[in-house]
Amino acid sequence: MISPSVSAVGRDPAYGWLMVFVVFTLSGLSFGALGAISVFLKPLALEFGWGRAETSLGYTTIAFSSALFGVFWGYVADRWGSRWFGVVAALTMSFSLFMLSSLTSLFQFYAFYFLFGAFGNAMASTPLFANVGFWFRHNPGLALGITASGGAIGQGIIPYLVGMAITSNGWQWAYQAMAVSYLVIALPIAFLVRESPRREIARLAPEKEVRHFPLSEKEVVIWMSFAVMFCCNCMSVPIVHLVPMLTDASRSLEFATSVLLVLMLAGGAGRIFGGKLGDVIGALPTYIIMS
């Protein structure tokens, strides 16, 4: 195993790039399940007679629980680290998906997706993204861009595979296949999650940081939260309704998921480009340009 030690001066630790791979994969799986809701939407609505709005609320449920618990897990990570976040997320994601394969009510549908968001997506995304950032001094934008691209790529690949599974064997088998695959892929690599030595030092012996930015940290968080909230709202609504909209227009499920795949692959490439651009011109100018 690559030692998670501080590298030579002028280079980022090699283990940091392994962390990029780990979190890329975990976030790809977790966000992929969000995107897959758009593929499950019509089969579940037909199976149980649910309305389109009721079924799509599953996406809202998982997004809400992810946001709510993401704040809490961020606090926990700052206090005690995120060493075991990946393991808990892997087990929760697999369990939730397996239970969804045998759901019989709308309440169960919401409950299991809430669980997926609270202890799966919320633990596999934001706190581990922050973990990755602490590993890098020289290429943080590129590292985080590659890491974040996992969520976009996962939202393209997972729905595409789920669409094929539903077409071949039905929605229940598709959920079961996801559960087994998530456990096999996510659990082994989750044990590779480590804290960077720099973050451990900062957490155990915090130092007063000299600030030159005109706004306080709290003000920055508030404004960035509003920006991200409106950005993600505008992005997520088309994602969850794209596949049903295309199949309603008499397009095949394979075609619909292919369109989503192309869209999200482009999104992944954009995140990598934006991350590298941030290393060159700075984070704020890049955010303005990409917006």
Q: Where does each model-flagged region fall?
A:
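Residue-level signature of mid-helix packing/kink "hotspots" within the transmembrane helices
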Residues: 35, 63-71, 155-156, 264-272
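Hydrophobic core of transmembrane alpha-helices in multi-pass small-molecule transporters
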Residues: 27-28, 96, 107-123, 229
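Helix-to-loop junctions at the C-terminal end of transmembrane segments
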Residues: 69-82, 270-282
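Helix-loop-helix hairpin linking two adjacent transmembrane segments in secondary transporters
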Residues: 146-197
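Intracellular juxtamembrane helix-capping segments at the cytosolic ends
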Residues: 44, 122-136
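Extracytoplasmic
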Residues: 15-52, 69-73, 158-159, 235-243
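C-terminal ends and interior cores of transmembrane alpha-helices
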Residues: 91-104
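Extracytoplasmic gate region of multi-pass secondary transporters
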Residues: 37-42, 217-276
